[in-house]
């Protein structure tokens, strides 16, 4: 295939993947936009940073972009805010831009306010999937909130909780009616609600439970009763979970692309920390069940994405969801998980290590703002800079001077010499000679006949002077040493130092500055998040916007009406005139505009 045709096909295929593109910020070294494509978002995003570093404002920027793109993509989102500031900022922004967002299906859930209630019956009848799966996920979510690693350590709670939920589901009731099923003294209502169950295990269990003495029943159910208390005691949660009419349906929310903004802050004292955590955990567990009921498409682009933003996620994400992050993309759930530092995950109960490992491995894109502590910085340095740190990087080189080679050359030698000498000699002498002469005959000396005497005197002087001069020239071979520098030793930069430098880069960052490495990137980049403008929205404008939004939702009702419906239903149960078996969800009267 021609390469141009191939890449043209690839570009066309990339455009067909549904979802929203996000602009994370500006790459500060180049000034270019750092973007996440819909395909990149499917592998999830992890954001962490200390308080005041820009993490929350970045999340707000991303949520705004998703809402602005709703008219084009129709992709929904769930935003869970444990502090309330993100919720307030988004409501103010949407109220200010109300005209352009009036067709976006906004679902605000605020645990701080008591005027309106979002009906959320977790025991609602499900059109798809096996209710046993939803019930089991509900049980696991409750166990997680109470710091239990699944239900293998609490088999009694698991069994009793399932028996309670099966009875409520088959009788088309709500979680509030669990208080009648756990009544230790009056078992009349309990017996009525547990008669004729089609689920064999639940029917068998209640047949045994209903013949227990009050003392034995209390011994069986006391622990389970304690775990249901947040649903039964906290008024805000009672009103939400106690509606058996039209309910928030996360399966429909995914299909319709609803934007659910949940403020689970404990500010105002309307809900406890335990209750807020339970609500958020149940919401996420229900979302996971709904996504699995929708199923996967045959191709990656067949499933419309649903975006999930969770700040301080370690308090709400169950191990079941965490360990299945790699599967979540197939079901269309694309998560953005945020917290202050990684070690928070490890400290989140018995399941912390499991959630930590799953998030670090499966959230393939990461943005890290300034944070502290070696125990937090080190794993992120490894994750962000892996493949960039060079173990062959030279830190120090030592050189020594050595004879590199010997060169043979010729050298001309010239010499000059001069010499001189002088000498002087004086001599004198005297010589006297005497002699006799005779004959020798027959061997005998005869008398001398001759005598001779002579003498001589002599003297003299001699002088000598010698001078000489000479020169010579000759060529002789010589050997010359060529000196040079030779590397004698090399010290490579140790991995510990490379990690330390990476940790320093993460630590030493200004506000709104972060280090990002998205899935598919070969190296991390320094980025600056965009400035998120604060809207000049007044409280009156925000309240008016919320009222219009609530009035359009068929499952939103005034809290007074919600309380009245619960009282009427419970009076019927107590009086014995319950029509629970024949109950069908009835939409509350709602102004639709």
Please place each PLM-identified region on the residue numbering.
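Conserved P-loop NTPase motor module
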Residues: 1-14, 187-196, 219-223, 392-593
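P-loop NTPase motor domains
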Residues: 4, 8-10, 14-32, 38-53, ...
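Extracytoplasmic/secreted cell-surface and envelope-processing proteins
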Residues: 87-89, 317-318, 345-347, 375-380
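Short regulatory helix/loop adjacent to the ATP-binding pocket of P-loop NTPases
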Residues: 90-94, 346-361
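Short beta-alpha connecting loops at secondary-structure transitions
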Residues: 122-124, 345, 363-367
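Hydrophobic multi-pass inner-membrane translocation pores used for secretion
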Residues: 333-336, 461
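Conserved H-loop
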Residues: 338-344
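Conserved P-loop NTPase catalytic core
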Residues: 353-399
